[in-house]
Design a protein with these regions (language model features):
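Catalytic core of Fe(II)/2-oxoglutarate
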Residues: 2-6, 145, 150-151, 157-161, ...
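Non-heme Fe(II)/2-oxoglutarate
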Residues: 2-125
Length: 266
């Protein structure tokens, strides 16, 4: 792969294409269920395309990423005056590129290899709409993350109450591209107020979707012994705002039109 395809659909496997067409009943509209906040699914991205995409990212973007490193503030301990009065702001370490910042070197590199166009494509928006089971606004945020050995994101909820468009929730869709040197990295999320749910996200082409806000964290990436320098997990990320309340129709209409097609234009 010399460039990313113009359409996200061209990365998908047959199962992924079925989601896009509204024919995968288990996944289409899954996040319209008010009891469900998160889904993780493998096999939706073609394995060969996933490997090629990861190699392309290594060559084109790795050198241009920005490091995000927000450690736990020491005053969370030194300023404590009462027993059991702990507080923990979001702590994290990873590398990233915000692709909307077009003057940045990473954004320019992403544009040159077609990544920005693919993440802004109609089919990526339609794929997200199919999982959400509801209308999404057409313009969405795009970002790339890269976790190396030991990189993580601590407990956080991604709630943005000061932003009117996102205050009542929004959708994140992540495409995971882990190298063979990665042993594991887990996503842990809260259910009924407790961190009881866990899934390994160190996949090559796995898809995760988040109906935010909810509490979750990403564990430190663990490399296979002796392969720390080669252990990376890329994440292609889209952030989508809701365009309308959820529809009761999350499955294909009687005429066969998939939800993704009906709601792709907000």
């Amino acid at each position: 792969m010399q460039r990313f395809p113009a359409e996200f659909a061209d990365l998908l496997s047959r199962r992924g294409q079925a989601v896009l067409a509204g024919m995968e009943s288990r996944l289409c509209g899954a996040l319209a269920d008010p009891r469900r906040r998160f889904l993780a699914e493998s096999g939706l991205v073609d394995p060969r395309q996933a490997r090629a995409a990861r190699v392309l990212l290594d060559g084109a973007l790795l050198a241009h990423l920005t490091t995000l490193a927000d450690p736990i503030p020491p005053e969370t301990i030194s300023d404590m005056t009462r027993n059991y009065d702990e507080w923990l702001p979001k702590a994290m370490r990873m590398r990233t590129a915000y692709l909307e910042r077009r003057r940045g070197l990473a954004s320019q590199a992403a544009a040159e290899v077609g990544l920005s166009n693919m993440l802004n494509s109609d089919s990526f928006h339609a794929f997200a709409s199919a999982l959400a089971g509801r209308r999404l606004k057409r313009r969405h945020g795009i970002q790339v993350l890269c976790y190396g050995a030991g990189d993580y994101a601590g407990p956080h909820n991604d709630h943005h109450p000061e932003e009117p468009a996102a205050a009542r929730g929004y959708l994140d869709v992540h495409i995971s591209l882990a190298s063979p040197a990665v042993e594991h990295q887990f996503l842990v999320w809260a259910k009924a107020g407790h961190f009881t749910e866990i899934v390994d996200v160190a996949t090559e082409g796995g898809v995760t979707a988040y109906r935010l806000p909810f509490w979750h964290y990403t564990t430190p990436l663990v490399a296979k012994p002796g392969l720390e320098a080669r252990a990376r997990r890329w994440v292609l990320l889209g952030t989508f705002l809701y365009g309308a309340p959820p529809s009761s129709a999350t499955r294909p209409a009687a005429d066969g039109t998939p939800p993704a097609s009906r709601t792709a234009r907000a």
